[in-house]
């Protein structure tokens, strides 16, 4: 049962890191990069 929890945490951490890198550098919208708030 503990292995399942550790696996879930590992997948969750990898998912968070993946999304963080993906949203950090958007593949499109070069114009939005110019108009920064």
Curated annotation (Swiss-Prot):
InterPro entries: PSII_PsbT (IPR001743), PSII_PsbT_sf (IPR037268). It is found in: Plastid, Chloroplast thylakoid membrane. The keyword Membrane applies. One of its GO terms (biological process) is photosynthesis. The keyword Chloroplast applies. Found at the monomer-monomer interface of the photosystem II (PS II) dimer, plays a role in assembly and dimerization of PSII. PSII is a light-driven water plastoquinone oxidoreductase, using light energy to abstract electrons from H(2)O, generating a proton gradient subsequently used for ATP formation. This is Photosystem II reaction center protein T. It comes from Spirogyra maxima (Green alga).
């Amino acid at each position: 049962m503990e292995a399942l929890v550790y696996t879930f945490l590992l997948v969750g951490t990898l998912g968070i890191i993946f999304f963080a890198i993906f949203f950090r550098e958007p593949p499109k919208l070069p114009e939005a990069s110019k108009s920064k708030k």
